[in-house]
């Protein structure tokens, strides 16, 4: 009895648990069905709402500039090197010991300034010997001339023969020749002595010394004592394509000096301004270019020999040219074009013919007029007839942010 009673209770408990589980399963299924229609409706509404958002989105921002009419200079550009107007290697003309140097490396000197001295002792001795020989031969000549005068008187009375008179005359002439040779020897010795004092042959800047005091130097030394480069004035040699020769020649015939500007290696800073000096007499067949030389006063020493520069030569000025920023000019399948803004800020593509241009601006010969507004930034988002919003160019950081950044950098440097 007890066993059957327990079995019935177990069956009851199992049935209750099964009923509870079935209830929870049925309740969850109903919840999922009720949630599905709402989700489907939301999903169906999403594309429509997205399309409405696109239609009501902001206008494409662009930056614009106005085409202006102005005089535009035409430059020919080339790469060049600064060269000294004259370069002189100062060498000794005589052999001897270097006694003194009278210059500071890098200083400016004038022609005739004393640069160095060689021991003059041997040259003074040679000069004294030459002067002594000259004095001796002058005395001999004076005595020979007196004897000749006596011979001439005696010959009148036939006390001396004609042969003796002629011999005395020849002796005088010979001694006179010796005197001339002695005078040349004196001049040579004096010149050797003078050359022991070495002076600057040209105005210019001296370089680093090539020899120290106390060394024995000679006229055959190839390195010399110092090199002088004439930098006032100084020259710029650069190259132009052979196609520019006619333009340069035509500009020269106008009679005005052609202005040449020297810019630094990065072409961002103007160093000096000079004038065209000459064109080479032949074209380099290998490169198809011609060498051009310009001269600069260089009083501020902005240019140094062997310095690499960018040359710009003004050959003409185009008057009343229509100019726009270079950033506005675009290139497409049909050629060059710009995006032009109308009064409603709608853009349209205009084909143009560009002329003179540089990194900042370009001349437009045809296609637009002065006063037209052209797009300079935001071009990649444009389509024909699209309306845009013209905005001002803005810096990546505000002045306050820049000041904060600088202060932070200072603190970081001190830490």
UniProtKB/Swiss-Prot annotation:
- What membrane topology was assigned to this protein in its record? Peripheral membrane protein
Q: Which GO terms describe its cellular component?
A: efflux pump complex; plasma membrane
- Is Cell membrane given among the entry's keywords? yes
Task: Give the induction annotation.
Answer: The mdtABC operon is transcriptionally activated by BaeR.
What keywords does the record list, in alphabetical order?
A: Cell inner membrane, Cell membrane, Membrane, Signal, Transport
List, as start-end ranges, the regions of compositional bias called Basic and acidic residues: 399-415
Q: Where in the cell is it found?
A: Cell inner membrane
Gene3D superfamilies named among the record's database cross-references: 2.40.30.170, 2.40.420.20, 2.40.50.100, Helix hairpin bin
Q: Which GO terms describe its molecular function?
A: efflux transmembrane transporter activity
- Major place of localization? membrane
Q: Where is the signal peptide?
A: 1-21
Question: Can you tell which superkingdom this protein's organism belongs to?
Answer: Bacteria
UniProt region (Disordered), positions on chain: 32-60, 392-415
Per the record, the similarity remark reads: Belongs to the membrane fusion protein (MFP) (TC 8.A.1) family.
Described by its record, this protein's role is as follows: The MdtABC tripartite complex confers resistance against novobiocin and deoxycholate.
Q: How does it assemble?
A: Part of a tripartite efflux system composed of MdtA, MdtB and MdtC.
**Would you tell me the protein name for this molecule?**
Multidrug resistance protein MdtA
- Organism, per UniProt? Escherichia coli O81 (strain ED1a)
Source organism phylogeny? Bacteria, Pseudomonadati, Pseudomonadota, Gammaproteobacteria, Enterobacterales
Originating gene: mdtA
């Amino acid at each position: 009895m007890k066993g059957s009673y327990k079995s019935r209770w177990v069956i009851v408990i199992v049935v209750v648990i099964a009923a509870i589980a079935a209830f929870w399963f049925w309740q969850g299924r109903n919840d999922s069905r009720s949630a599905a229609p709402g989700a489907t409706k939301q999903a169906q509404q999403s594309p429509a709402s997205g399309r409405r958002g696109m239609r009501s989105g902001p206008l494409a921002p662009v930056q614009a500039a106005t085409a202006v009419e102005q005089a535009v200079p035409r430059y020919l550009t080339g790469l060049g090197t600064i060269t000294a107007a004259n370069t002189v290697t100062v060498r000794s003309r005589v052999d001897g010991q270097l006694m003194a140097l009278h210059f500071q490396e890098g200083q400016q000197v004038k022609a005739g300034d004393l640069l160095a001295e060689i021991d003059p002792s041997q040259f003074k001795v040679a000069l004294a010997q030459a002067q002594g020989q000259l004095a001796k031969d002058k005395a001999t000549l004076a005595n020979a001339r007196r004897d000749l005068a006596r011979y001439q008187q005696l010959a009148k009375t036939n006390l001396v023969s004609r042969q003796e008179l002629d011999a005395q005359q020849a002796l005088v002439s010979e001694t006179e020749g010796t005197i001339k040779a002695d005078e040349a020897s004196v001049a040579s010795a004096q010149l050797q002595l003078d050359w022991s004092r070495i002076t600057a042959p040209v105005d210019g800047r001296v370089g680093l010394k090539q020899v120290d005091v106390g060394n024995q130097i000679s006229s055959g030394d190839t390195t010399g004592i110092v090199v002088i480069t004439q930098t006032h004035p100084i020259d710029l040699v650069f190259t132009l394509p052979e196609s520019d020769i006619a333009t340069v020649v035509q500009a020269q015939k106008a009679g005005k000096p052609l202005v040449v500007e020297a810019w630094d290696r990065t072409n961002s800073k103007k160093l000096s301004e000079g004038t065209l000096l000459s064109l080479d007499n032949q074209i380099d067949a290998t490169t198809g270019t011609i060498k051009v030389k310009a001269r600069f006063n260089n009083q501020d020493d902005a240019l140094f020999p062997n310095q690499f520069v960018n040359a710009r030569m003004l050959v003409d000025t185009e008057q009343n040219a229509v100019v726009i920023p270079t950033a506005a000019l675009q290139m497409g399948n049909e050629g060059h074009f710009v995006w032009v803004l109308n009064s409603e800020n709608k853009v349209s593509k205009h084909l143009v013919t560009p002329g003179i241009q540089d990194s900042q601006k370009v001349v437009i010969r045809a296609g637009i007029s002065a006063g037209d507004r052209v797009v300079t930034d935001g071009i990649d988002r444009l389509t024909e007839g699209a309306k845009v919003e013209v905005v001002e160019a803005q810096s990546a950081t505000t002045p306050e942010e820049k000041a904060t950044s600088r202060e932070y950098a200072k603190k970081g440097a001190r830490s």
